[in-house]
Design a protein with these regions (language model features):
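The feature captures the beta-strand-to-loop junction immediately N-terminal to the Walker
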Residues: 30-35
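Conserved ABC transporter NBD signature motif
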Residues: 56-71
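C-terminal coupling/interaction segments
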Residues: 247, 252-305
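ABC transporter nucleotide-binding domain
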Residues: 165-255
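Catalytic Walker B motif of ABC-type/P-loop ATPase nucleotide-binding domains
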Residues: 148-152
């Protein structure tokens, strides 16, 4: 298990992360989300031992990570700002990785290079942004690490490459019990990938939860009746965002699905649809309850709404 215990990291007079605590179970995919400047990258770098926390502890199975080569030999970190040796080719980078990570799997490396159609002898500096991301992921996954840390790694990848890389991560988690921590400013990017999510805003933890728990017992409902009614008809339920147009009402409800069906069916609807909420919709509700504005924390763009 990885633990952050009351971790604070500052840069001069700027508090990048403030008293952050979380527990990351072994063999899970853990997401950190937040807007630009929320502290995601700083938290991840502190987690990896790139930065030293001024306060608190970062522990891997009770072992501190900072300046600990025994821990760091089991982890691979891909920064949002990729770095490769000047003029190095994928083949040359693989030789370097093999020296650092003895379990580096050349067979897997060649297979993944071939899949992405990356020239093993060409300078990585001449690659496009997406190809550089692919190369970084090929090298990282070929190391077969115990811990994989990804900072905005899916940025710049096309949908096909993104889906394939996610499948590789899933397989390594399932087969080798690899622990993965990934940051993103997009909930939608992580919704189908992560087991748990941590939301950061201005360096502080807003919310941490298992995705399954977040989505459980939250639904959106569309219902219609052939008689006149108002919101009071649903007083037996805990509902949010109620809207009524003509005879049709839409709202969000927090309750068990079977209870919602039983209560609403007893009122003789002519239309009843009960659908699960998206992760974004659940976060909106949870954050509103905590007094936060979802759009401010995640910087949701108009074309993403």
């Amino acid at each position: 298990m990885i633990e952050l215990k009351n971790v604070t990291k500052t840069f001069e007079d700027v508090v990048a992360i403030d008293n952050v605590s979380c527990k990351i179970p072994e063999g899970c995919i853990y997401g950190m989300v937040g807007s630009n400047g929320a502290g995601k990258s700083t938290a991840l770098r502190t987690l990896c031992g790139v930065y030293k926390a001024e306060q608190g502890e970062v522990l891997f199975d009770e072992r501190p990570v900072f300046d600990n080569t025994e821990v760091k030999k089991d982890l691979v970190f891909i920064s949002d700002d990729l770095y490769f040796i000047n003029a190095a080719s994928p083949k040359r980078m693989a030789k370097l990785y093999k020296r650092i990570y003895p379990d580096f799997d050349y067979e897997r490396f060649w297979e993944l290079l071939d899949y992405f159609k990356l020239d093993k002898n060409k300078s990585i500096g001449t690659f496009s942004k997406g190809m550089k991301r692919q190369t970084a992921m090929v090298l990282a996954l070929s190391c077969k690490p115990k811990y994989l840390f990804l900072d905005e790694t899916f940025d710049g990848l096309d949908p096909v490459a993104r889906k394939f890389i996610k499948s590789l991560i899933y397989n390594d988690v399932a087969e080798r019990n690899m622990t993965t921590v990934v940051t993103s400013h997009s909930l939608r990017e992580l919704e189908d990938l992560c087991d748990s999510l941590l939301l950061l805003h201005k360096g502080k933890v807003v919310l941490e939860s298992d995705i399954g728990d977040l989505k459980q017992d939250n639904y959106k409902v569309q219902v219609a009746f052939d008689y006149d009614y108002d919101k009071s008809l649903f007083d037996e339920l805990e509902i949010f965002d109620f809207e009524k147009k003509g005879s049709v009402s839409n709202f969000i409800v927090s309750a068990k699905e079977q209870d919602v069906k039983k209560i609403l069916n007893s009122k003789k609807p002519v239309l009843l649809d009960i659908l699960p909420l998206s992760l974004e919709e659940v976060f909106t509700i949870k954050m509103r309850d905590l007094g936060y504005d979802f759009d401010e924390c995640l910087e949701v763009k108009e074309d993403e709404k």
